UniProtKB/Swiss-Prot annotation:
Spans annotated as G5: 324-326
Transmembrane stretches, start-end: none
Organism expressing this protein natively: Thermotoga maritima (strain ATCC 43589 / DSM 3109 / JCM 10099 / NBRC 100826 / MSB8)
Region span, G1: 187-194
Residues annotated for GTP binding in this entry: 187-194, 233-237, 287-290
G4: region residues: 287-290
Major subcellular location class: cytoplasm
Protein name per its UniProtKB record: Translation initiation factor IF-2
Residues covered by region (G3): 233-236
Alphabetized Pfam families for the sequence: EF-G_D2, GTP_EFTU, IF-2, IF2_N
Range of residues in the leader sequence: none
Length: 690
């Protein structure tokens, strides 16, 4: 037996790679991932050790002792420690939830995007599943108060439908089963995406498409060694990101295709940024290795330099598979790696009951009427089911598989064409099966009313709004999408923006590319609540319309100085104003009056400046501070006044302090809020040099 990779050894032991990695860690065997090698001698030792453990595990075990009182008490204490909050239906807003759980909004936004791939906005009205994800992240239980009567504005039944599946995933984990992974193939134009899918499906799709470039979206399912994989074929990555922006994630794994004779190109970078923003596992397929000028090692180097993807064989954690889609070389290994990643990520579903699915394509067919291509996520979709989508409803009249053969049922991860909707459903929306056609109609009508009511309030972040947003004190993040006319301009933009980095605010460049601002850029900005900055480029008409529709702020500039100045103003607006104390006057207590039902009042001679009724005062006695606080009342003779200036006399009652003596010195001051400027990297470096 020659040396083996960890996942190959796992097969021999009839274990999953994940289980074997855990066992190896307990045994003290140092391996990095499922792709790491184990030599023959070590493999034999591991096999012997694990087989011995299995034998011991099969032996009858001694009866377990009942838990002692201390253990029971400890469990009760632990349960009590778990925090629980109650929310009303109208409290499903990010700012309210942040206040209730004691975590700043910006911290929640950052954690949810980085750890769970969910893009949120300050003050956003949240879906139930988004609330549950937030509370799950911070280990807090939730209880939604039920109300006897709820209006259209208070409850979205689509959220309740989604919650049904969330609860199934939480409460019935033992019923979840593995499902086929859904894979999106991305990459630069002409790098071989369609040819790869063609090779996998063993059909000649590429030859029928104009110029060999994909012109339509489709989903296909193939079988590999008895296991199924579903592939979404998309022109570019607009579908992928638009689906994410609308909350309908269908993709489990991304295969990033890079040509070995061309290397990492602009659309490769763009595709990678979209996949990275979605927090989806990425497998790199280096294609066209059969070409004479193919250079796999150089391509790997570009993956490291341009994308930060380090291949596993170089000590990183990115699976890179050299292939030739034309000859088929390496394709079997790629499929094997897809199944391995699916197994490692434990892709599962709830296999029974009413189905939910994601629409990936929809249109109005002259003969068949409204049709939709979808991928089933959970349950079983059947002919005759009553269904709802975001904007329409219907009853499933016909189902067709990816080869356009009529079927009666569709199962998780299966691509299917659905006929029977009343109208063309929104692309990238979720589909749910409900109990009846009447209920479906009621749900959608209420949904449309709700969306219409919210339409005016729906908007994303723009540069001006950043001046009012997120006034918490933790570090803030601004997501940027940059487009410029040349790579030199992109480099100049990045350099200028990096100089605006500060301790208080992080500028996160989600994507930077060359060429006009497209719909793909807009959808990416919508997904991450980012701002698009263009330098010497135009916005195409379709992207402009989409930006207006999605509420994405798009700015274009011809002078880099103006872009930087606008950004500086926005960053300054993100910082909470600084409170600065300003001394406005001094005085001395010349007489102390005792007034019944009032207490002690100081007769004060103003020495300089003024005393402000809405300001503050400090009292010094023999050089020592004896009081600092507010002025309760300020009088000039018998009149209440707001200000007394030197050299006038006045009567002052101090808030909560009566221990005043003649001769006490007074210092009057006010607190002013001063606009705070970030300390930019460049300015900080200059100061340090000085």
């Amino acid at each position: 037996m020659a040396r083996l990779r960890v996942y190959e050894l796992a097969r021999k032991l009839n274990m999953s790679p994940k289980e074997l990695l855990q066992e190896l860690e307990e045994l003290g065997v140092n391996v990095k991932s499922h792709m790491s090698y184990v030599d023959e001698e070590m493999a034999n030792i591991i096999i012997d050790l694990l087989e011995e453990d299995n034998r011991k595990a099969k032996q009858p075990s001694k009866p377990k002792k009942e838990k002692g009182e201390e253990e029971v008490e400890k469990e009760v204490v632990e349960k009590k420690k778990k925090k629980k909050i109650t929310l009303k239906p109208d409290e499903l807003k990010l700012d309210i939830i942040a206040e209730k759980i004691g975590v700043p909004q910006n911290k929640i936004i950052q954690d949810m995007f980085v750890k769970r791939g969910i893009a949120l906005r300050p003050g956003q009205i949240l879906k139930l599943e988004e609330v549950e994800q937030i509370l799950k992240e911070y280990k807090i239980e939730i209880e939604i108060e039920e109300e006897q009567q709820t209006s259209v504005e208070e409850v979205d039944e689509f959220e309740l439908l989604e919650k049904r599946y969330q609860e199934l995933y939480e409460k019935e984990k033992d019923k979840l089963v593995p499902r086929p992974p859904v894979v999106t193939v991305m990459g630069h134009v002409d790098h071989g995406k369609t040819t790869l899918l063609d090779r996998i499906r063993s059909t000649r799709v590429a030859e029928r498409e104009e110029g060999g470039i994909t012109q339509s979206i489709g989903a296909y399912q193939v079988e590999v060694n008895g296991k199924k994989i579903t592939f979404i074929d998309t022109p570019g990555h607009e579908l992928f990101t638009e689906m994410r922006a609308r909350g309908a994630q269908a993709t489990d794994i991304v295969v990033l295709v890079v040509a070995a004779d061309d290397g990492v190109m602009p659309q490769t970078i763009e595709a990678y940024n979209h996949a990275k923003a979605a927090n989806v596992p990425i497998i790199v397929a280096i294609n066209k290795i059969d070409k004479p000028n193919a250079n796999v090692e150089k391509t790997k180097q570009e993956l490291v330099e341009k994308l930060g993807l380090i291949p596993e064989e170089w000590g990183g954690d990115t699976i890179v598979v050299p292939i030739s889609a034309r000859t088929g070389q390496g394709v079997d290994e790629l499929l094997e790696m897809i199944l391995l990643v699916a197994e490692m990520n434990e892709i599962k579903c709830y296999p029974e009951g009413p189905a939910r699915a994601v629409i990936i394509e929809s249109k109005l067919d002259k003969k068949m009427g409204p049709v939709a291509s979808a991928i089933v996520k959970d349950g079983v979709l059947k002919v005759g089911d009553a269904v709802v989508a975001s904007n329409t409803y219907g009853r499933v009249r016909n189902l067709f598989d990816d080869n356009m053969r009529p079927i009666r049922e569709a199962y998780p991860s299966q691509p299917v064409m659905i006929l029977g909707f009343e109208d063309v459903p929104d692309v990238h929306s979720n589909v749910y099966v409900v109990e009846s056609a009447e209920k479906a109609k009621e749900i959608v009508e209420k949904r449309l009313q709700r969306l219409e009511a919210q339409k005016q309030s729906r908007k994303h972040i723009n540069l001006e709004e950043l001046m009012k947003m997120m006034q918490e004190k933790e570090k803030k993040v601004l997501n940027l999408i940059l487009k410029a006319d040349t790579y030199g301009s992109v480099a100049a933009l990045k350099n200028a923006i990096n100089k605006l980095q500060s301790k208080e605010i992080e500028l996160n460049i989600v994507h930077a590319g060359v060429g006009e601002i497209s719909t793909s850029d807009v959808m990416l900005a919508a997904a991450v609540d980012g701002v698009i900055l263009g330098f010497r480029v135009k916005v195409n008409n379709q992207a402009r319309r989409l930006a207006e529709q999605e509420g994405v702020d798009v700015r274009t500039y011809s002078i880099i100085y103006k872009l930087v100045e606008d950004l500086k103003l926005a960053l300054e607006g993100m910082l909470e104003p600084e409170e600065v104390e300003e001394v406005i006057g001094h005085g001395e207590i010349r007489k102390v009056f005792k007034i019944s039902k009032v207490g002690k009042v100081a007769g004060v001679q103003m020495l300089d400046g003024k005393a402000d009724r809405n300001g503050f005062v400090r009292i010094y006695r023999n050089g020592q501070l004896v009081f600092g606080g507010k002025i309760e009342s300020l009088k000039h003779y018998k009149e209440d006044v707001s200000v007394v200036e030197a050299p006038q006399e006045c009567g002052i009652k101090f808030a909560g302090f009566d221990d005043i003596h003649e001769g006490d010195e007074l210092e009057f001051y006010v607190i002013r809020k001063v606009k705070r400027k970030p300390t930019f990297v460049e300015e900080q470096a200059d100061q340090e040099q000085k």
